[in-house]
Amino acid sequence: MTSVEEMPLPPPTRLPPFLHARVGGLPRAFWALWAGSFVNRLGTMVEPFLAFYLTGVRGLSVTATGMVLALFGLGSIVSQFVGGVLADRVGRRATLTGGMLATAAAMLALGYATATPVLVALVFVLGLTIDAYRPASQALLADLVGPAERTRAFGLLFWAINLGFAVAMVLGGTLSRAGFSWLFWVDAATCVVCGVLVWRAVPETRGRRAEREPGGFADVLRDRVAVGSVLVVLCYGFVYLQAYSTLPLAMRRVGLPPSAYGFAMALNGIGIVIVQPLIGAWLGRRDHSRVLAAGVAVVGAGFGLTAFAASAWAFAATVAVWTLGEILFAAVSSAIVADLAPPHLRGRYGGLYGMAFALASLLGPPAGGGLLGLASWSPWLLCAILCGTAAAGALALGPAVRRRRRALKH
């Protein structure tokens, strides 16, 4: 059996019942991870503005920039794999902190690189480091929080990440006008703060593997339930990422200005910030597989309805629909992966989950843009079909997921 040190229970809280049901009862180490993630997201400025930096400051063509960003995406896939292995072998805390510090160093080096070959190499290096913390963070949360509270905890982390990212977009746009070097320094600084905070405030939680227990990535790939769940994530990610690539192109195609896209996406952030804390505790009491299926189906419906949108308000309405699905998906998807994973393999399971999203980021945007060029409705039909198929898959996997959830001992 894998041995995992039990985390001490949090002290009694005097929060009002409404707040206690939503944020109470979670260990202090979780809140340190939450705070570090929030600070890190407050400074997430380099990745969203990287295309602007490469074309506007370093003078790369649009085609060359696309190829460089593809290298970044490939690096991210490798990053998730390596981060998952290190989280299980070296430790969650060390991997998260090391990943954050390495990302900070890569960002500063990239910010001052001028020669194109060096620039391209450093973008790939940044891709290799930037997501290494994710599997460790997911495994750390699963170690710290018991199965009954994981849905709520993952939901709160999702909320913090989205709130921080929304603020970062505003700050990043402002700072970029003063000089792009500010973005690299602020992003690097928040990475360092996150890494140091986790190192000082969060204990190492990695369990020790018994000799006869499986312990490699191949063992994860032999887990059919986990692989099936990750395929659901891949389909969802393919569709969800159309919001940042194909959706703005579709809105421009019908004559809408960039401000209309900004308004629609602002509704996404506002919806998450308002709705997630209200329903997080309730979602924790629901069957995870059914919530996942519902979330994926609602996302498919929202993107499918985009085929009929022709005004700013119509596009905003479709965003509101799939935002609800995004909230449902985010609340349970990571919890399902954590429930499926043996404690000593949680990093690798989280790495496989992250690799699915990274692969979706490589496949989704070019496929969506290509289909939009053929027919304005075609990418949205594909989105609806993919999400419908994935939702059916999540329901089919439900009985196996429930059996595993009952069988695994935390």
Language-model-detected regions and their locations in the chain:
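Structural signature of the two symmetry-related core transmembrane helices
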Residues: 94-108, 290-304
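Helix-to-loop junctions at the C-terminal end of transmembrane segments
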Residues: 79-91, 275-288, 372
